[in-house]
UniProtKB/Swiss-Prot annotation:
Name listed for the protein in its UniProt record: Protein GrpE
PANTHER family: GRPE PROTEIN, GRPE PROTEIN HOMOLOG, MITOCHONDRIAL
Annotated family: Belongs to the GrpE family.
Superkingdom: Bacteria
CDD domains: GrpE
A GO molecular-function annotation: protein homodimerization activity
Gene this protein is translated from: grpE
The UniProt record lists the keyword Chaperone: yes
Cellular component GO terms, alphabetical: cytoplasm
Species per Swiss-Prot/TrEMBL record: Pediococcus pentosaceus (strain ATCC 25745 / CCUG 21536 / LMG 10740 / 183-1w)
Predominant localisation class: cytoplasm
Length: 190
């Protein structure tokens, strides 16, 4: 009988141990499932963060590339403008001398030799300016253009000179290609 009791006690211990181990295995399986789900959720969140960072960096990269292209275009445009108008400073410096030559030619009492010499200088200056794309602004009889003309006086309009027409040029204006070096000083009909 003592043997039977010992066997019963052992069987009860084994069954208790088995049931305890079984419940521990179920709890462990449930905990493993929860841990796996948590890890999966965390991994998905991390992936979303990394994708957002990637998208942001990609956007910054594209914007930086566009800015570089814009800077390059701006630089090329400035270089072309510098090349196009490289003689502007020289042309502006020559214009007053040309004006003085024209005034000297306008004096009637000068000797013929002096007049001939001054006329040759004027011709050479005009030729040099023309070769460097400097041209006189046509003004007299033209419609007044504030970009090309500087009105210094107005006169009443009449049949010969309608309103907003240049009546007389007081000082010639000049352009370098399409840029105004000096506007023509004019009298305008109002």
């Amino acid at each position: 009988m003592a043997k039977e009791k010992k066997e019963e006690v052992k069987e009860e211990e084994v069954s208790e141990a088995t049931s305890t181990e079984g419940s521990t295995d179920v709890e462990s399986t449930n905990n493993d499932d929860l841990t796996t789900e948590t890890q999966a959720t965390t991994a998905l969140d991390d992936i979303k963060k990394v994708e957002a960072e990637r998208d942001e960096l990609s956007d910054k990269y594209i914007r930086a590339q566009a800015e570089i292209v814009n800077m390059r275009r701006r630089n090329e445009k400035e270089q072309a403008s510098l090349i196009k108008y490289d003689g502007q400073k020289l042309a502006k410096a020559i214009l007053p001398a040309l004006d003085n030559l024209e005034r000297a030619l306008a004096v009637e009492s000068a000797s013929e030799q002096l007049l001939k010499g001054v006329k040759m200088v004027q011709t050479d200056l005009l030729k040099a300016l023309k070769e460097n794309h400097v041209a006189e602004i046509e003004a007299e009889g033209q419609a007044f253009d504030p970009n090309m003309h500087q009105a210094v006086q107005t006169v009443p309009a009449d049949d010969d000179h309608p309103a907003d027409t240049v009546v007389q040029v007081l000082q010639k204006g000049y352009i370098l290609k399409d840029r105004v070096l000096r506007p023509a000083m004019v009298i305008v009909a109002q």
